[in-house]
Amino acid sequence: KIVEIGCGKGYFTELLEKRGFKNIYGFDPAYEGDNPNITKDYFSEKYKSINADLVILRHVLEHIEKPYEFLTHIQNATSKDTKILIEVPDFEWIVENRAFWDIFYEHCNYFDATFLSSFFKNATSKKVFGTQYLLMLASLDELRKPYVKHRYQKNIFKESFRNIKDFLSQNTPLVLWGGASKGVTLLNIFDKNRQLVEYCIDINPKKQNKFIHFGKDI
């Protein structure tokens, strides 16, 4: 039995089914489909038993304010033999690529390989998606309180900010390509007065002819 917590629209659960896996379940309050195996709710301590062989968290843990407590709820609802597969953005990649747009309000926590692995006594991890994400497999019965060791400089994005500000000071017409979280984060930082960007381009038809929260046309 596989349970994906935070399964979104159910794409990954459907992919697993197509690959031949059986007994796949999910949790997500935003799910809009009609799969009876997906519970339209947040997973919480009220779910006492999910009896899973594998629990999957794909791009969920970085949105959880208290990740250790959340993992404890999952541990309490499963057996000692349950495995957990976690995928999160890799903070080391963010730092190396100066990808400051990947730091935004929806992410409560950031993980590198050392920090993520510290949640468990033993864990196997690797970098995926061009080293942008971390994928880790562990046993839930080996969950432990993590330790944090800060090893990053405070001003790692300072030079990137300076270069962008220098470019923006040229007063050339600008268009935002992509009206999702990264584009909005860019505007939050560099266009607080809503004067630099004329409009936004986005491939999502549900966004077109509407506005992002800055009042810019899409």
PLM regions and their residue ranges:
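Conserved SAM-binding loop
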Residues: I2-R98, Y105-K121, A138-L140, V184, ...
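Conserved S-adenosyl-L-methionine
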Residues: N122-Y133
